[in-house]
C-alpha cells in the first residue's frame, strides 16, 4: 500500500501550496484524455482523497499518526540480512520514543521506536538485541542494534 504522500508525489514535509501544486499536476497527468495507454488504471478518487486528507491540518496529523502505527505493526522481527545497521545510540530520545531522520528520504524523525517495540526485539549472538524498522515516509528498512542497560 502506498501512502497519500506517494500518491501525490510529495514529501511528508510538503507545504499546503506544494500539496495544491502536486494535486493539480497529478490530476492533469492522470486524466483519461491525457493517458496514451487506455488500459492504464487511473485512480482519481484516490488522488482526491489523498489531497483532502493532507491539505487539512487535523486530518493530516491523524493520518501521519496512523502511518506511524501501521508501520510499527508490519513485523519487526525478521532476519535483517543486507540492511544498513544502526545503533539505538544514533537515535534521539524524547518522551519515551526514540526517533531518527531517514538516511534515504531525509524525512525528519520518520524512523521511530518505543519501549514496547524494543521489547519485541530479537536477541543476537553478542548479548544484545536487533529490531527491524521501516521509515514512515519511504520504503527504507533498517536494522537497529541495542543492549539492555
Swiss-Prot record:
Q: Where is the J domain?
A: 3-67
Q: Name one GO cellular component term.
A: cytoplasm
| Keyword set includes Chloroplast | no
InterPro entries (UniProt xref): DnaJ_domain, DPH3/4-like, DPH_MB_dom, DPH_MB_sf, J_dom_sf
Q: Which CDD domains has this protein been placed in? A: DnaJ
Q: Which UniProt keywords apply?
A: Cytoplasm, Iron, Metal-binding, Nucleus, Zinc
User: What exactly does this protein do?
Assistant: Required for the first step of diphthamide biosynthesis, the transfer of 3-amino-3-carboxypropyl from S-adenosyl-L-methionine to a histidine residue. Diphthamide is a post-translational modification of histidine which occurs in elongation factor 2.
Q: What is this protein called?
A: Diphthamide biosynthesis protein 4
* Native source organism of the sequence: Candida albicans (strain SC5314 / ATCC MYA-2876) (Yeast)
Question: Which gene produces this protein?
Answer: JJJ3
Amino acid at each position: 500500500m502506498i501512502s497519500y504522500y506517494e500518491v501525490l508525489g510529495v514529501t511528508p514535509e510538503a507545504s499546503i501550496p506544494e500539496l495544491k501544486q502536486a494535486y493539480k499536476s497529478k490530476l492533469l497527468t492522470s486524466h483519461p484524455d491525457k493517458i496514451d495507454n487506455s488500459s492504464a488504471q487511473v485512480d482519481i478518487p484516490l488522488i482526491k482523497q489523498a489531497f483532502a486528507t493532507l491539505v487539512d491540518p487535523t486530518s493530516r496529523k491523524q493520518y501521519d499518526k496512523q502511518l506511524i502505527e501501521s508501520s510499527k505493526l508490519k513485523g519487526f522481527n525478521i532476519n535483517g540480512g543486507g540492511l544498513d545497521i544502526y545503533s539505538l545510540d544514533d537515535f534521539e530520545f524524547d518522551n519515551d520514543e526514540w526517533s531518527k531522520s531517514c538516511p534515504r528520504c531525509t524525512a525528519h524523525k520518520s524512523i521511530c521506536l518505543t519501549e514496547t517495540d524494543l521489547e519485541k526485539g530479537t536477541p543476537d549472538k553478542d548479548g544484545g538485541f536487533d529490531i527491524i524498522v521501516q521509515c514512515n515516509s519511504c520504503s527504507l528498512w533498517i536494522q537497529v542494534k541495542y543492549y539492555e542497560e
